[in-house]
From Swiss-Prot:
Its main location: cytoplasm. Probably plays an important role in intracellular peptide degradation. Mn(2+) 2 binds at K196, D201, D219, E280. Mn(2+) 1 binds at D201, D278, E280. GO terms for cellular component: cytoplasm. Gene3D superfamilies: Zn peptidases. This is Peptidase B. It catalyses: Release of an N-terminal amino acid, Xaa, from a peptide or arylamide. Xaa is preferably Glu or Asp but may be other amino acids, including Leu, Met, His, Cys and Gln. Its cofactor is Mn(2+). It holds the Pfam family Peptidase_M17.
Amino acid sequence: MTTEIMQISLSHNPADARWGEKALISTNDQGVTIHLTSHDQLGGIQRAARKIDGQGIKQVKLAGEGWGLEQSWAFWQGFRGPKGQRSVVWAELPANEKTELEQRLQIIDWVRDTINAPAEDLGPEQLAKNAIDLLCAVSCDAVSYRITKGEDLREQNYAGIYTVGRGSDRAPVLLALDYNPTGNPDAPVMACLVGKGITFDSGGYSLKQSAFMDSMKSDMGGAATLTGALALAAARGLKERVKLYLCCADNMVSGNAFKLGDIIRYRNGKTVEIMNTDAEGRLVLADGLIDASEQNAPLIIDAATLTGAAKTALGNDYHALFSFDDELAQALLTSAHSEHELFWRLPLAEFHRSQLPSNFAELNNVAGGAYSAGASTAAAFLSHFVKNYQQGWLHIDCSATYRKSAVDQWSAGATGLGVRTVANLLLAQAKQ
């Protein structure tokens, strides 16, 4: 590993032939040059940063022309890794772009570090407290919150979070956080954000194999993403009231854990039969969505690392988007495009809502064997807990939250993707 500060410059000319056809980087006495000859220039910078990091270069200076906000951020996305120290001397930016870069570094790096944290270090209550700390660091005067924990969840009829989390020695937690910059306690709520915060998912009695369990410290990625999104929106100047609900629990095996055949009775009257304890994320989100629906906000967004089916469809490159509201879905896709993040809308139709049959309850927590659209039926399950599910509700299945191994653009671990898109959407909705 080199300890000298390496200069990194950008060029729109191809590399000399000795570096190979279509070479992305070349070196000389002045440092490393990134050659931007493809249409995907931000992606090229990110891939080049991975190569530079892979060569053991950990201290760099972005030099020369072309280093705007998005180019600088693309470099950091690729350069950053989950272990070891890295430092960047940033190119000069206009004041507003410098502020935005600093906010992304603070908030999105928090999201990535939080998702990467070992489950031993990050239980349900700690996740909730860390979320409070982040939002207080950004706009503490506008933040109030309530933590409901353990037996209090049962007594207050948060049946999903309590049931999933009761098998762990670490108590389940619901964080209800109110971001209200208006100063008016009666101000209307513009949006509610509901995040899945499963701090470790063993699968419960529907036990995962090790190959599928080894990344389950990241099963709280939805909660971290929405916390970061609210923090970034606040840092960018959001003036409307938003409520954040983090549904936090461990899904473990024990003598007190929930079992197949159990029936959960929710506060909105729905009953759910458990046919797979590894479909637990939707069970905790249901409690948060019930609370969110009671706020009568025109916008509800939930985010969760919910299904393997979404990853099968989209890989780890895109987040999956589901909604009955075409206009709102398009608004999110517009926000994603403007923030250079990848989302893809997957099907969600009224008939999916009837594909969760149970002989003993109103709903099954997994689709019947004849229905194989697992990501769509998971979204449909959630719709039963949103009062006005046909309008103003978005579900994000966070398939791009975490990578088990490095690829050409990303190190192993959390990506932070989705934070900017949701923050952008909140600000866009606030202008309407």
